[in-house]
Curated annotation (Swiss-Prot):
Underlying gene: ruvC
CDD domains linked: RuvC
Organism: Dictyoglomus thermophilum (strain ATCC 35947 / DSM 3960 / H-6-12)
A GO cellular component annotation in the UniProt record: cytoplasm
HAMAP family: RuvC
This protein's name: Crossover junction endodeoxyribonuclease RuvC
Record function comment: The RuvA-RuvB-RuvC complex processes Holliday junction (HJ) DNA during genetic recombination and DNA repair. Endonuclease that resolves HJ intermediates. Cleaves cruciform DNA by making single-stranded nicks across the HJ at symmetrical positions within the homologous arms, yielding a 5'-phosphate and a 3'-hydroxyl group; requires a central core of homology in the junction. The consensus cleavage sequence is 5'-(A/T)TT(C/G)-3'. Cleavage occurs on the 3'-side of the TT dinucleotide at the point of strand exchange.
Enzyme type, top EC level: hydrolase
Subcellular location: Cytoplasm
Membrane in keyword set: no
């Protein structure tokens, strides 16, 4: 099962692609889709759509996962995350894929075992579970990989 996870934003969208086969979780690819701050919102969203579509074409994932938008004190940030989420959902829909939405609590519980885990604890567990040399950077990438791990564990009933 190939799972792609996204931590959306208009400036940086982290992504991770994992393959679950038998009892093993293997990293296929991970990275960040970034846009210059001087680009218009339309140009940023168009670029994000094209890049997400390319990843979906290339890897043909069985599942697409994103984190639920949480309440953010900065309304501008919350709106920009929502716009990026909409673009990812549209790209997935055009590839006949539904997007599974996980809450931060679900991700922390499944990856760390504690719903109030810190970002550092989640990132450490991502590194350990995937047997990576270093914690993926930027944080958005580690978050996207955590979403994939959480989705896989959820499918296994963990």
């Amino acid at each position: 099962m190939i799972v792609i996870g996204f931590d959306p934003g208009t400036a940086i969208t982290g992504y991770g692609i994992l393959n679950k086969e038998d009892d093993k979780i293997a990293v296929i690819e991970y990275g960040a889709l970034t846009t210059p701050s001087n680009w218009s919102i339309g140009r940023r969203l168009n670029y994000l759509f094209d890049q997400v579509s390319s990843l979906l074409d290339l890897y043909n994932p069985d599942a697409v996962v994103m984190e639920e938008v949480f309440f953010n004190k900065n309304i501008k940030t919350a709106i920009s995350i929502g716009q990026a989420q909409g673009v990812i959902i549209l790209a997935a829909q055009q590839h006949q894929r539904e997007v599974s939405i996980l809450t931060p609590l679900e991700v922390k519980l499944s990856v760390v075992g504690y719903g109030r885990a810190t970002k550092d604890q989640v990132q450490y567990m991502v590194k350990e579970v995937l047997k990576l040399k270093d914690i993926p950077k930027p944080d958005d990438v580690a978050d996207a990989l955590a979403l994939c791990i959480s989705y896989i564990y959820k499918q296994e009933g963990c």
